[in-house]
Amino acid sequence: MPKLRSATSTQGRNMAGARALWRATGMKENDFGKPIIAVVNSFTQFVPGHVHLKDMGQLVAAEIEKAGGVAKEFNTIAVDDGIAMGHGGMLYSLPSRDLIADSVEYMVNAHCADAMVCISNCDKITPGMLMAAMRLNIPTIFVSGGPMEAGKTKLSDQLIRLDLVDAMIEAADPNVSDERIDAIERSACPTCGSCSGMFTANSMNCLTEALGLSLPGNGSMLATHADRKELFLKAGRQIVELCKRYYEQDDASVLPRSIGTFDAFENAMSLDIAMGGSSNTVLHLLAAAQEAGVDFKMEDIDRLSRKVPCLSKIAPNTNKYHMEDVHRAGGIMGLLGELDRAGLIHKNTHTVLGMSMGEQLDQYDIIRNQDEELHKFFRAGPAGIRTTQAFSQDCRWDTVDNDRVNGCIRNKENAISQEGGLAVLFGNLAEDGCIVKTAGVDESIWKFTGTAIVFESQEDAVAGILGGKVKEGHVVVIRYEGPKGGPGMQEMLYPTSYLKSMGLGKKCALLTDGRFSGGTSGLSIGHVSPEAASGGAIGLVRNGDIINIDIPNRAINLEISNEELATRRAEQDQKGWQPANREREVSFALKVFGHFATSADKGAVRDKTLLK
């Protein structure tokens, strides 16, 4: 029978000093011997996705203590990618993921906690906590802050739904009036919560459901809705139950590594492909799999992308649907239900509810279960009132959206595309692969041949796009922005948004060893591996080179001979794999990240071989 980890610091004569300190935190005599459960919060006033989390930790903690555990809350950092976007702050975004993972490990191991409830929400916080959960392998439940309501504004006598990407695109369009931009800016982000489309934050929170590590509804229930409170309360009760099953019944099936198996990672990736999620999810799933000891690779993602159809298009891939619409259509359980009916889900994986994924789908899929209370749960909708308060409204749609022919979620027979929403491309430009979000690419440009225009940084690319250097037919190459080369692997949301602003959204491609925001759409190909700083062929591209992109055949190639490529490589080896004429101040902390970082095909995790 596993011993409580916390017994290390709470039991025995020699731990009198530690117990004295535990007592000073409020522990009573009868608390010693109970599981100590870390409530890992990420409240901050910098991030709308986290601004409402201040009281959530104590909400969960109170429920844990009612159920027989001892709850101790601590906080992690949280970076807002949207606010950090377009300047040097973006260099810190991806490194913050690993810092969060480390900080959770430090706190939990230093204090010998027995289990965790992870209260996350935005882009790097959920992945960082997920990496920590897999690393620590103690009972863990994720409960996120929930999505923001979609923005709405009246323009040209039409009520238009908006999100933050609309504000970015319109602001750079010289033909758009200041008044229109102001109206969009003020309406795009109306409430607390993670940005309202299927951007990185919401994608990752949805994937925790598919992995089995969060409760049904976690990825889609709005932050503002009163029903979300029950997810926090239930997480507090359920984590105590998981502790009992593991520490009292020796049931290891409740541990993150037992839940997050290879099959579970396949389920998560299949969901991601079906919903056209953020390409960042690939990076984070690969990283989490490594922490879990699961051999899940780019080749597996490529294989899944060839058989899993695109069943839903959500903003930024369409203006029609946002996360509130996904929830109305049955949420992630609804999407997984359709994948199950198509024979594309492993139903035997475990979940934090203590049941198999198949059993969970029987209970929570609105197509197979007509229970009135279940449908009421998924009818939870937006109020359309500006607020930073969680659980502040109780509005509901009249009906759920169970239209699997033309609705927000489709069945396989009526799929938006039999091609999945994400694809892996290989070729002489990306020998270890690169990622494109096909759900956000117009099918007319799935095959694209263009002329390279090369930039050594995101900043130069932005100046080139807004300055008119980029023309129709160009492939914009932004290099030395990978995990090592940045360092930090910046998101390229501004370059992709500005291509749309300049009317080039369907007339150009963008290729980078950096990455993209979940808000990106268009022919944007990222995560090119190996990256330029690691000797990748993207570092050998020259202005005027022809680049061929072929999504249906999963290929991307630089149209020069092998001999010319070898000659260029030899020349670059002599010069060194560094950006030409780029002035960028890089802190010591970022240099450390860059030194240890692997390429994107490895999840941009730290290279452990450097420590041997």
Curated annotation (Swiss-Prot):
Reaction(s) this enzyme catalyzes, per UniProt: (2R)-2,3-dihydroxy-3-methylbutanoate = 3-methyl-2-oxobutanoate + H2O; (2R,3R)-2,3-dihydroxy-3-methylpentanoate = (S)-3-methyl-2-oxopentanoate + H2O
Cofactor binding note: Binds 1 [2Fe-2S] cluster per subunit. This cluster acts as a Lewis acid cofactor.
N6-carboxylysine modification, residue list: 124
UniProt: [2Fe-2S] cluster binding residues: 122, 195
Highest taxon in the source lineage: Bacteria
Pathway as given in its UniProt record: Amino-acid biosynthesis; L-isoleucine biosynthesis; L-isoleucine from 2-oxobutanoate: step 3/4; Amino-acid biosynthesis; L-valine biosynthesis; L-valine from pyruvate: step 3/4
Gene3D superfamilies: IlvD/EDD C-terminal domain-like
PROSITE patterns assigned to the protein according to its UniProt record, in alphabetical order: ILVD_EDD_1, ILVD_EDD_2
Necessary cofactors: [2Fe-2S] cluster; Mg(2+)
Gene Ontology molecular function terms on file: 2 iron, 2 sulfur cluster binding; dihydroxy-acid dehydratase activity; hydro-lyase activity; magnesium ion binding
Segments forming a coiled coil: none
Active site: 517
Keywords: 2Fe-2S, Amino-acid biosynthesis, Branched-chain amino acid biosynthesis, Iron, Iron-sulfur, Lyase, Magnesium, Metal-binding
Family matches, as Pfam families: ILV_EDD_C, ILVD_EDD_N
Signal peptide from the UniProt entry: none
Positions bound to Mg(2+): 81, 123-124, 491
Enzyme class: lyase
EC nos: 4.2.1.9
GO terms, biological process: isoleucine biosynthetic process; L-valine biosynthetic process
Entry GO terms, CC: cytosol
Protein's job: Functions in the biosynthesis of branched-chain amino acids. Catalyzes the dehydration of (2R,3R)-2,3-dihydroxy-3-methylpentanoate (2,3-dihydroxy-3-methylvalerate) into 2-oxo-3-methylpentanoate (2-oxo-3-methylvalerate) and of (2R)-2,3-dihydroxy-3-methylbutanoate (2,3-dihydroxyisovalerate) into 2-oxo-3-methylbutanoate (2-oxoisovalerate), the penultimate precursor to L-isoleucine and L-valine, respectively.
Subunit organization: Homodimer.
Family statement drawn from the similarity comment of this UniProt entry: Belongs to the IlvD/Edd family.
Protein name, UniProt field: Dihydroxy-acid dehydratase
Organism, as annotated: Haemophilus influenzae (strain ATCC 51907 / DSM 11121 / KW20 / Rd)
Phylogenetic classification of the source organism: Bacteria, Pseudomonadati, Pseudomonadota, Gammaproteobacteria, Pasteurellales
Gene name tied to this protein: ilvD
